[in-house]
Amino acid sequence: MSENNKAILEAANAAIAQGNYEGFLSFCTDDTEWTFVGDRTLKGKAAVRQWMATEYVEPPLNIVANLIAEGDFVTALGDFTIKDEDGKAAYYSYCDIWRFRGDKMVELRAFVIPAEVKAETSNAA
C-alpha cells in the first residue's frame, strides 16, 4: 500500500505541474482537510480549489527531495517556487505529511517556511 500511495502522490504532483488542478483534486477525497501549520486549515475540495485559484497563478515548481511512505502516510520533503500575479517568485521549503484513505488523499499537514535563494556567482569581469 505504501508504494501505491507514493505513486498516487507523484501522479497528483504531476497534474499540478501541468496546471491541471482538477486532475490533482481527483486524487483527494471530497472531505479532504489541509492544515498549513501555524497558518490555516482548508476543509473540503471546494476550499482547496478556491485556495489553489488564488495561490497558483501559474503552476508551482516543486522539487521533491524525499518521499517516505509508511502505512497510510506519505511524507514529502522538498522545495517549491510560486509566482504571484506580477510574476515575482517566492521560494519555500516544506514537509508535507499526507494521510490516505484507500487510494485518495484525505489529510495534509504542511510545514512550509520561506527559503532564501542563494545568488548565483559569476566569474565575468
Indicate residue ranges for each PLM-predicted region:
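Short, well-ordered alpha-helical segments enriched in acidic and aromatic residues
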Residues: 18-35
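A beta-strand edge to alpha-helix "cap/lid" segment located at domain peripheries
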Residues: 1-14, 35, 39-42, 47-125
